[in-house]
């Protein structure tokens, strides 16, 4: 005999409604949210008044590099101090010898770590250059397909070495987009490329040719970084790409004069520019709250995990929210609530999935049950993820993947 519901989550605290509800699910959709749902059901979860959240969004990762520092008593690569050039050089050495199977294994390990922590959506930037070729892209796309019932992965064909530094990058990016990458990305058009106009124009040319969005790394600080982001926003408008471009990192906002940002915010809003800051590297003076209050779309992300760029990381966005609040010295309930939005609804907007995201009737049943009373306490307590639901199916229970 058929049941009215495939799954009901009972006594779920929904922070957006500030009350406790039942959530009724059929297939992969939420079909009812009421104080008490009646009807027959195949499976039930009692949240016991604890917080139920939409799945977390990790809006900027590098899954093809993950776990490359592991396997020895001390983390590989980390006998030397960090510099950008050293990390790029170590990456080139790695990709020269890495196998398809090794990269794919690391991607799957990364994804499983994310899923255990309740992350159900991620965007990963995959190196494409004359050394890596499309080796990493092939491995990531294959893993993405195998992981589709656990996590949604967007893949950026990323010119890590620079379009104008590594002249094979353009043709290899084209090949990667032909293979099915979802976005195109570049890096530091000023200090890496030494050609702001040329690199941005090439990125838009590729994006428009393949009808994909753009996600651009801009680490540059000060006036150089602000200029690069402003030109990216201006070109977004000129190319008819409003709402389709993301700037990742944007460290320059942390040291730019406040009046510069005040002048630029209308441009960013007009262009629909999206931003991502990564909790492992967010500068302490990053004006996160100011940007959010101004209506700028700002997500949060883990960035690299245990590789030649960063020796640490575990793909846990709730831990990331705690790190972010501590780096920025945020303490109020309101501010912690805003940080929570960065790993949920703001991240969903960055990925362009907001129409199907959230706890509302008709939206996808991608949910996390936490051992916590609220988002604020979840961050403070580092709450356990009691249950993770993807497409209406329980995929994690008691911190074990069961799907």
From Swiss-Prot:
Q: What is the effect of changing residue 65 to A?
A: 30-fold increase in kcat with ammelide as substrate
Report the cofactors.
Zn(2+)
Cofactor: binding details: Binds 1 Zn(2+) ion per subunit.
Q: Per UniProt, what does mutating residue 160 to A/E do?
A: Almost no effect
Compartment(s) of residence? Cytoplasm
The entry summarizes how activity is regulated as: Inhibited by N-ethylammeline, N-hydroxyethylammeline, N-isopropylammeline, ammeline and 2-amino-4hydroxy-1,3,5-s-triazine.
* SUPFAM superfamilies assigned to the protein according to its UniProt record, in alphabetical order: Composite domain of metallo-dependent hydrolases, Metallo-dependent hydrolases
Impact of altering residue 309 to A/F?
A: Almost no effect
Question: Which residues does Zn(2+) bind?
Answer: 60, 62, 217, 303
Q: Which GO terms describe its molecular function?
A: hydrolase activity, acting on carbon-nitrogen (but not peptide) bonds, in cyclic amidines; metal ion binding; N-isopropylammelide isopropylaminohydrolase activity
Q: Which Pfam families match?
A: Amidohydro_3
Protein encoded by which gene: atzC
Comment on pH dependence: Optimum pH is 7.25.
CDD domains according to UniProt: Bact_CD
Q: Which residues form the active site?
A: 249
The reaction(s) annotated as catalysed by this protein in its Swiss-Prot or TrEMBL entry are: N-isopropylammelide + H2O + H(+) = isopropylamine + cyanurate
- This protein's source sits in the domain of life called Bacteria
Protein known as:
N-isopropylammelide isopropyl amidohydrolase
Keywords carried by this UniProt record: Cytoplasm, Hydrolase, Metal-binding, Plasmid, Zinc
Q: How does it assemble?
A: Homotetramer.
E.C. number: 3.5.4.42
Pathway it works in: Xenobiotic degradation; atrazine degradation; cyanurate from atrazine: step 3/3
The biological process GO terms on file are: atrazine catabolic process
Summarizing the function annotation, the protein's role is: Transforms N-isopropylammelide to cyanuric acid and isopropylamine.
């Amino acid at each position: 005999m058929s049941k009215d519901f495939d799954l009901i989550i009972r006594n779920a605290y929904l922070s957006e409604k500030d009350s406790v509800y039942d959530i009724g699910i059929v297939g992969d959709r939420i079909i009812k949210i009421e104080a008490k749902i009646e009807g027959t059901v195949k499976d039930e979860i009692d949240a016991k008044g604890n917080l139920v959240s939409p799945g977390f969004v990790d809006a900027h990762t590098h899954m093809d590099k993950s776990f490359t520092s592991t396997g020895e008593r001390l983390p590989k690569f980390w006998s030397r101090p960090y510099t950008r050039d050293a990390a790029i050089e170590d990456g080139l050495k790695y990709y020269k010898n890495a196998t398809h199977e090794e990269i794919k294994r690391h991607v799957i390990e990364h994804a499983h770590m994310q899923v255990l922590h309740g992350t159900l959506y991620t965007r990963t930037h995959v190196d494409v250059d004359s050394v890596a070729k499309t080796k990493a892209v092939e491995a990531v796309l294959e893993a993405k397909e195998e992981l589709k019932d656990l996590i949604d992965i967007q893949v950026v064909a990323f010119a890590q070495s620079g379009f104008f530094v590594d002249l094979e990058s353009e043709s290899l990016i084209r090949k990667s987009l032909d293979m099915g990458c979802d976005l195109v990305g570049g890096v530091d058009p000023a200090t890496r490329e030494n050609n702001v106009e040329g690199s941005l124009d090439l990125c838009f040319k590729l994006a428009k040719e393949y009808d994909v969005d753009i996600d651009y790394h801009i680490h540059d600080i000060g006036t150089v970084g602000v200029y690069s982001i402003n030109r990216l926003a201006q070109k977004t408008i000129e190319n008819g790409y409003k709402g389709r471009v993301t700037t990742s990192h944007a460290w320059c906002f942390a040291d730019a004069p406040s009046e510069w940002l005040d002048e630029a915010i209308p441009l960013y809003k007009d262009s629909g520019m999206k931003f991502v800051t990564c909790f492992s590297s967010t500068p302490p003076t990053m004006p996160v709250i100011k940007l959010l209050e101004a209506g700028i779309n700002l997500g949060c992300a883990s960035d690299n995990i245990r590789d030649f760029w960063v020796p640490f990381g575990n793909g846990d966005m709730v831990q990331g929210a705690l790190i972010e609040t501590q780096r920025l010295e945020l303490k109020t309930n309101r501010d912690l609530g805003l940080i929570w939005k960065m790993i949920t609804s703001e991240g969903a907007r960055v990925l362009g999935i907001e129409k199907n995201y959230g706890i509302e009737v008709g939206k996808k049943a991608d949910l996390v049950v936490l051992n916590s009373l609220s988002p604020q306490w979840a961050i403070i307590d580092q709450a356990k993820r009691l249950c993770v639901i993807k497409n209406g199916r329980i995929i994690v229970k008691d911190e074990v993947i069961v799907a």
